Every structure is written in structure tokens, then in C-alpha cells.
Amino acid sequence: MKYNIHVKRCKKCIMPEVPGHIVIDEDGICQFCKQYSKTQTDVAQTFQDFDAEKKLSILKKKVSKYKNKGSYDCVVSVSGGKDSIATLYIAVKVLGLKPLAIFVDNGFALDEMYDNVKNATDILGVDLLIYKTSDMLKLFHKLIKSGKKLYYCRICHALLDNAILSNCYKYGIRLVLGGYTKGQQYIQNQELMWIYEESDRNIIELLQDDEEFQKYIPLYENQHKFFQENYGPIQQLSPFKYIEWNEDNILKLITEELKWKMPKRSWPDKSSNCFFNYVAQYLAEQQFGYAQHESELSVLIRNQELTRERAVEIIETPIEDSDLQKALQKLNLSIDDIKDGGLYNHGKTTD
């Protein structure tokens, strides 16, 4: 799918119509919104119905068994973005944990990401481990040159999770807190499964005869099985399942308390994603029609944590030549390796 001038989206969320995968009915509603409405009707009381105090009490009880078991109570995976920095704050100030912050640089980190991580850990008095990998640069060069349909965020997340969990294992830490919003529980989102499956098949095929990267094949054959077999005892959870996610409140808190700064430019709007995300999103839109961002924002809309208007504004953040060139040049590639020039911009929403 190319970036079109008009993209038909669900009237309730922002999932785009993609033949065979996202079906929008005559009322303009996608199958996932209809399924959500039915689920809410069928269940007498869900976790989402609990009040804020009860949810926080459940979270505190979950993490209490990990306290005072070693030098650190948990790992907080920090990217320098607003959600992960807020998670670090919650770990220390709300949950009373002693965390080890781990920042994994995939080779495309923004300067502001480093600054935000350093400021937050200094102010909160948290130990920081910086893990920088060169594998991603070499691997992504190979994958892009192949021309195969691949979802780069999935590929990257798996490698980052592996790095985080391997360090947990090394330091004997059994709890990982991540700054995932409810929408970012991407591994469980049904609308992404077919994308994962096709991407995984293609990367396995590409790595079969590669002596350097063959070691990652088991990771992409079955991620759940790989992580369970290698890191089963390690518990992963996000505070934002238990604490309301509010973009404005989070930005105010971390800006005032932790000297957090918004990157000058990042995709999407008001994010702190690595600068390869421009390429990843562009290719995902071209090859699959959408990516995890559309899914994440749609979940937040359904949970009434984000307005559809704001979600549309976020997903239509433009991608320009200069954005793509910066990431591709680091891989010794050019725009010609993904598409002939021009201005790249998300399709405008049409109902």
C-alpha cells in the first residue's frame, strides 16, 4: 500500500481499511471496534471498571514480592521517551522500588533520548546501564537490501527485549517494568498478527545462510517460546495497565520533575522514538497498510484515554525526505533503496 491522499479509516478508531485484514462496514466501523463493544457488553465487570485506588493497590501487591531480593528490585527499560521516563518515576516515587535503569541504543538514538535518561536517573538517584549494539545497523542494511516485506519495529523490539532480559538474568533481577501503554501491548493485538507472521517468515528465510545472524533465528521462529524458555522466571509488566495514561499529565510531570525535553523532531508527533522509526513506519505503510502505531492509538481511543481527533493528528505526522535520509545514510543506503524520491506524507483521513 502506498501513501495515498485519502485513507478510509474506522469512524470510531483510526484503523485504515486494508482488504482482507481490516474491514470497515457500511456504518464506517471496523471489526475490532465491534468486537470491543460486544466484549464490554458481555462482561459484567472488567478490570477497567475498577477505580484508580483499587488498580494501584493491585499493582503494589504484584511488585511487593520482588522487593529487597538483591541489589535491585527491578529493571526499568528506559528509552528516553515520555512513557518510559514516567515509568521510572512511578517505580521510585509511587511503588518505592530500587530499580536498575537499562537504556539500549539500537544505533539510531536521538541526542535528547540520552539527555532525558541521564537527567531522570541523576535526579531519581537510579543506577544506569547503557547497552549499545552494532548488530542492528548491519542487520537492517541486509534486510532493506533484500526488498522483503518486513516489520522493522517487531524485529527491533525482539532484539531490545532480548538485551534487557539477558541483563536481568545476568544481575539476578526477576521483574521488568516497561513504559508500555495499553495500546502498546503490541504482541497481543489481533490486527497485527498477520504482519508479524509474514515478517517473521521473511526474516527467518533471510537469516538461514547468514553465519553472523543465524543465532537470532530461534527468536523469530517463536518469540513467546524463546523468551519463556530462556527467561521464564522474569516477570514483565507495565504500570500503565494499572495507572491511567494521560499524555498531558505525563508531559507536565516529567518536564517539571525530571527535566525531560521533547525531541526537536521525531515520529510520530510528541514522541521520542529513534530516528529509524521514520523508515520503519514508511515501509510498514507501504508493505502492510498500517503498523503498531495505528493499533496502539486505536486501543487508547476505545479505552477513552485518547480522543480520535488527537489520534488522527498523531498518525498524520508527516515523513519527509530528510527524515528518511538521516536513518538510511547511517546504513550506507539511500532513498532509492526504498523508493524513488519525493515528499512522504501520511494519507489524510477520510470517513
Where are these regions (language model features)?
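Nucleotide-activated chemistry modules centered on ATP-dependent adenylation/adenylyltransferase
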Residues: 1-74, 90-351
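Hydrophobic positions on the alpha1 helix immediately C-terminal to the Walker A/P-loop
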Residues: 86-87
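Short, glycine-rich nucleotide/cofactor-binding loops
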Residues: 74-83
